[in-house]
Every structure is written in structure tokens, then in C-alpha cells.
Amino acid sequence: MDENKKRALAAALGQIEKQFGKGAVMRMGDHERQAIPAISTGSLGLDIALGIGGLPKGRIVEIYGPESSGKTTLTLSTIAEAQKQGATCAFVDAEHALDPDYAAKLGVNVDDLLVSQPDTGEQALEITDMLVRSNAVDVIIVDSVAALVPKAEIEGEMGDQHVGLQARLMSQALRKITGNIQNANCLVIFINQIRMKIGVMFGNPETTTGANALKFYASVRLDIRRTGAVKESDEVIGSETRVKVVKNKVAPPFRQAEFQILYGKGIYRNGEIIDLGVQLGLLEKSGAWYSYQGSKIGQGKANAAKFLEDNPEVAAAVEKSIRDQLLAAPASARPAALADEPADADLDY
């Protein structure tokens, strides 16, 4: 850059700082780049698929899927992991369907969890914005976008037409809170439902509620689906779950993770540790026996998982090794099976 341009730029920067304050414009090279802080989802495979070890703080995340696919379970698991790190969490229950007992079974400290059950969509989003601006809340869950009913619709008659009200409400709210979320370094997760577009003959007829604003503002979008049942004998004790990262602004997108959700217990984390540990050679599998550092830990996956449950220090050591290997390596160097191979189907539990 020639001297005249340098002087002009310096004068412009000085004027901007004088008018808008120091730091309004800065060179990216003046400050050391820092890794994006993340909060674990409770699923080891999903944390790895997200590329940074979890969901990014200071960003908006959308989780959507069909009914009973595990959306709320995944968000409650995220809250439980955040609380373990000392985070303050809030749950804006627009659906009025939060079960404290189920949340407690997933590891959530319900005594410290902030809960709101707003009457209207405007109230829910205003509460969310105030919690964000407090700079004191680390994780906020909004369950769900479909339940954010505008006040005009609630006060109107059944059958009244309210075209685009919810879409305008979401667009206005997201414009307002996005900057505050970044400044507060707060993770805001919107749970969303799926609807079918009428008259679609070709392509995917599925869409999410709340129009397009959330799709643009979200840094991460997760599509969660139930792919099968987990059985013990003839009894169904859980569900096979697949999560696809359909949008990711902080790492490469379109990776996916498969894990199991056990009813009343949540994400089967030890099963994931065993699967990934075997793939990476951290655990040895010989026939039905699993071994760790030369010592047998169980015959069959269920017994190996029980060993990890009884010896959390071993589980933590294996998980740390998995994270160190997979999160430090570029995506091209990771085993392809981690993205595409389904969870071990033979009685995982």
C-alpha cells in the first residue's frame, strides 16, 4: 500500500474509533486467533462430527427432526454437560412440556436450571433476549419454534388467518438478539419441528417452521432422526439415532453421527466410547472380549460398558485419547467410518 493510502486509512480508522469507540475496526492480525469455545452435546460421536468438540458458544444453533426423534433429549444432555463445567443454563419451555424428572435422569441439575413457560411467542423471545443481555447465562434452549405463537393469533378466533406473523416475529427477534449472543458468548439452541410442503412432486417436501430467518442466522443446524429400536430380548429399551450436521459455519458440514438413546437414561455414551476406541485401536476386541491396555474389561459390549461405568477414570482416559486424535486431525485424516458407519447393531446395551 502506498503512503497516501496508508495515511488515508489511518485517518479513517482514527475517525471511526473516535466516533464509535476503540475496537470498532481492527486488523485480524493484531490479535492472536483463539479456538472457538464449545459445549459438549453429551454424544462423543456428535462432538467429533461438529469438528470443534461440541456446539459453539456465542452462536445460534437449530436442532430439528420428526416427533420423538430425540430433540429435547439432546438439548437436555447439552445442558447437563454445560452444568458440569459450572455453566448457568435456561430452558424457555414454549411447549409447556418439560418433564423435570426426566431431565434429572439425564444428569441435569434441575434445582439450578432456569425455566420459563411464556404465554406468547413475543414474551418467549423477549425473555430470551433479556437473559442473553444479562451476560450471566451460558446456554439457553427455546423449545420450540413451532410453539412461539404470536400474541395476535392467541387473542384471535379459531380459524382466523394470520399470514406470515410467526415468520416476521422470528425474523425481527433474530435480528435483535444475534449481536447480543456474540457479545455475551452465549449458546442459544432453537428446537424446531418438521412440516410438509403441499404439492411438492420432486425433491424433499420437508421444511421447518418459522420461515427462513433461523436457517440463515444459525451457525449450526442439526437434523436428528430415529433410525431403529434398541432391544433387550423382545423389550424395546431405546432408539437408534442419527444426527446429520446439515449446516456448520465453524467446521466442515455434512458429517453425521450415530448413537443410541436409552429410555430413562439418555445418550449411551459408553457405547460410543467403545465403538470409537476399537476403531482407533485404543481398545482391543478379540472375539466377544474387549481389552484395555492388555487387560480384559468385559465379554460383550454391554459388560465392557458396565466396566467403563464402574471405572469412570478409564472411560475418561479413553475419551480424552479419542478427542485428542480426532479433533486435532484434519477431516481428511479421520477414519471414514466415523462419519458413515452405523452404531454397533448387535445388542449394544
From Swiss-Prot:
It is found in: Cytoplasm. PROSITE patterns: RECA_1, RECA_2, RECA_3. InterPro entries: AAA+_ATPase, DNA_recomb/repair_RecA, DNA_recomb/repair_RecA_CS, P-loop_NTPase, RecA-like_C, RecA-like_N, RecA_ATP-bd, RecA_C_sf. ATP binds at G65, P66, E67, S68, S69, G70, K71, T72. SUPFAM superfamilies: P-loop containing nucleoside triphosphate hydrolases, RecA protein, C-terminal domain. Transmembrane segments: none annotated. CDD domains: RecA (cd00983). It comes from the Bacteria. GO terms for cellular component: cytosol. The keyword Transferase does not apply. One of its GO terms (molecular function) is ATP-dependent DNA damage sensor activity. Keywords: ATP-binding, Cytoplasm, DNA damage, DNA recombination, DNA repair, DNA-binding, Nucleotide-binding, SOS response. Can catalyze the hydrolysis of ATP in the presence of single-stranded DNA, the ATP-dependent uptake of single-stranded DNA by duplex DNA, and the ATP-dependent hybridization of homologous single-stranded DNAs. It interacts with LexA causing its activation and leading to its autocatalytic cleavage. Belongs to the RecA family. PANTHER family: MITOCHONDRIAL DNA REPAIR PROTEIN RECA HOMOLOG-RELATED (PTHR45900:SF1), RECA (PTHR45900). This is Protein RecA. It comes from Azotobacter vinelandii.
